[in-house]
């Protein structure tokens, strides 16, 4: 079904069964599969391919040569009906690739709202990206990676499969991340190691001085006081009883499956 207010360039191919919302614009030489749904106000520039069971929300901008919903690169995948879900107001720049999920990983690759995926970024199968994240040019997420909200991934950085990166964390450019990065932390290098808290980013998002101080304190307990991970987790868990930001930090440590960058 194609809404009467949608614009589709004569050279674009939209297969029967696709759902195209109001005021959608589909540019030259785009290819849209039969199981695709594109929400109101979303714009596809030129040469965009959207395939598979893919749902794209409202007011997204998708630039030329992006590929969304294509078969993933997991060797165990044999064409099962998995999908991609993308929220609202995302900017997906040139040559970005977003692959569909796997049955083993829950069946869905999911992108939230208000994200910026820069040129050549790759989102592998079963990744979950929160809201207001930035993945810079040539950034790569391996399969099953989870990003919290407001995460920044520097250019040419790669995140290993199954890693989690907490909200408001930042990964510097040209980094290789093989373990989980807690919320609010800056990490860089190959393999990535912590370099402090993302103070400037937190200030921009309205964190007050008291909140910044308790986050710094939690960071020092984990990284600067010579404690074992178990000792640090216990002390941070006690502080978390009285502060929501420390609770987020503490819960992330407790739920880590790949270990924490140290």
UniProtKB/Swiss-Prot annotation:
GO terms for biological process: lipid A biosynthetic process. Its EC number is 2.3.1.129. InterPro entries: Acetyltransf_C, Acetyltransf_C_sf, Hexapep, Hexapep_transf_CS, Lipid_A_LpxA, Trimer_LpxA-like_sf. It holds the Pfam family Hexapep. It catalyses: a (3R)-hydroxyacyl-[ACP] + UDP-N-acetyl-alpha-D-glucosamine = a UDP-3-O-[(3R)-3-hydroxyacyl]-N-acetyl-alpha-D-glucosamine + holo-[ACP]. One of its GO terms (cellular component) is membrane. Transmembrane segments: none annotated. Belongs to the transferase hexapeptide repeat family. LpxA subfamily. Homotrimer. HAMAP family: LpxA. This is Acyl-[acyl-carrier-protein]--UDP-N-acetylglucosamine O-acyltransferase.
């Amino acid at each position: 079904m194609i809404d009467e207010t949608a614009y589709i360039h004569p050279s674009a191919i939209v297969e029967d069964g696709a759902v195209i919302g109001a005021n959608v614009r589909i540019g030259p030489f785009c290819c849209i599969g039969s199981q695709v749904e594109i929400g109101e106000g979303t714009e596809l520039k030129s040469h965009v391919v959207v395939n598979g069971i893919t749902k794209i929300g409202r007011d997204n901008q998708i630039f030329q040569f992006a590929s969304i919903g294509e078969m993933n690169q997991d060797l165990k995948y044999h064409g099962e009906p998995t999908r991609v879900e993308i929220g609202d107001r995302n900017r997906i720049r040139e040559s970005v690739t977003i692959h569909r999920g796997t049955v083993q990983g829950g069946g869905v690759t999911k992108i939230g709202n208000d994200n910026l995926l820069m040129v050549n970024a790759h989102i592998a199968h079963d990744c979950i990206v929160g809201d207001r994240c930035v993945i810079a040019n040539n950034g790569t997420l391996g399969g099953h990676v989870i990003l919290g909200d407001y995460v920044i991934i520097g250019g040419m950085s790669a995140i290993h499969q199954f890693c989690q990166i907490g909200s408001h964390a930042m990964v510097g450019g040209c980094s290789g991340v093989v373990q989980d990065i807690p919320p609010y932390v800056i990490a860089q290098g190959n393999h990535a190691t912590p370099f402090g808290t993302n103070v400037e980013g937190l200030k921009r998002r309205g964190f007050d001085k008291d909140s910044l101080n308790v986050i710094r304190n939690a960071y020092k307990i984990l990284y600067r006081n010579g404690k074992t991970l178990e000792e640090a987790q216990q002390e941070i868990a006690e502080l978390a009883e009285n502060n929501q930001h420390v609770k987020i930090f503490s819960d992330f440590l407790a739920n880590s499956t790949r270990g924490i960058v140290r």
